Amino acid sequence: MSSPASSITQAAAGALIAAVHTAAARIGFAAAVAVTDAGGHPKAFDRADAAPFLTAEVALDKAWTAASFHIPTHTWNDYLANARVAPLAGHPRLMAVGGGYPIIDNGRCVGGLGISGGSYEQDQQAAEQALTALGFEVPAH
């Protein structure tokens, strides 16, 4: 699903967005979905008609955070409790809210996935379902 350049392909990014919308509908919410390449640059994006406009920026920042550090965004809550790491909370794009996951293909981070629109638990659930459906690895964090 990735290219030799170690980033997610456009086709895989589009399939991931479709899988997220399917999962979100099944769970019961309208989502904004962002996919970045391995460098955190936007690769694909879509916002459901019923998703609030703020979800667009949040989804992109979740994807960026996940791609940047190769860990799910919800794990940042524990890290930010450490006084030596806490200053990172002031970074304007860092998202410590569930719904952002690195896209792991054959052990390599090929991008980031960010979902916004449901509760953080719903965003996480939709991300995990979509990643699993397309054969990407879901980090154990």
Q: Over which residues does each language-model region extend?
A:
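Flexible, solvent-exposed loop/hinge segments and secondary-structure transition points
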Residues: M1-H141
